[in-house]
């Protein structure tokens, strides 16, 4: 995993829309799709912090490193600012979750089976992180291959559908789990 000051590398993003307190729509995207839109739409490049320039060789700040801040709110604010240049639908905030949160949710809902690289894969609380890393190994840096974190999007879709029909007891457990995740900074909101 690639660590960042305010968490990990944001490989998968989701655009989530709520209307009248209800989930209206969601779309998952690879961070590099957002980076391409940002590069096409930005008018002025942002100089990256020294570590990003020095260690990653970037002459300008890529959107995936916008959160290179020790203060999550400052990094999220920069991300929102950069996001505006993409031409994508407007956003009102940023929610960051680590794979640990996905694991915790799978612990509540039970395993899911999704098709990864053309084969069904059973993903559960114990193997979700390993599956993400397996995808990194399988694709071995191939920039034309789907993101190794695409598995999060596949699992995320199933979890959203399950949670949208969950009973009250499961939703209460989810709230408790999210509270713990927020306390541990595995879930951050801006």
Predicted region positions:
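Non-catalytic, solvent-exposed segments at the cell envelope interface
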Residues: 1-190
């Amino acid at each position: 995993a690639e660590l960042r000051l305010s968490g990990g590398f944001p490989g998968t993003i989701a655009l989530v829309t709520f209307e009248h307190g209800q989930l209206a729509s969601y779309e998952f995207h690879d961070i590099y799709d957002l980076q391409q839109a940002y590069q096409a739409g930005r008018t002025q490049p942002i100089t990256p912090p020294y570590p990003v320039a020095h260690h990653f060789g970037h002459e300008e700040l890529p959107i995936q490193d916008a959160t290179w801040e020790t203060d999550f709110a400052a990094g999220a604010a920069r991300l929102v600012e950069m996001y505006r240049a993409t031409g994508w639908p407007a956003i009102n905030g940023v929610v960051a979750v680590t794979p640990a949160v996905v694991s915790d949710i799978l612990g509540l809902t039970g395993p899911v089976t999704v098709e990864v690289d053309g084969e069904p894969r059973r993903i559960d609380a114990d193997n979700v992180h390993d599956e993400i890393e397996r995808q990194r190994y399988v694709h071995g840096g191939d920039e034309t291959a789907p993101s190794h974190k695409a598995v999060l999007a596949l699992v995320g879709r199933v979890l959203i559908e399950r949670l949208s029909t969950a009973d009250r007891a499961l939703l209460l457990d989810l709230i408790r789990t999210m509270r713990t995740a927020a306390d541990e900074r595995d879930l951050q909101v801006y």
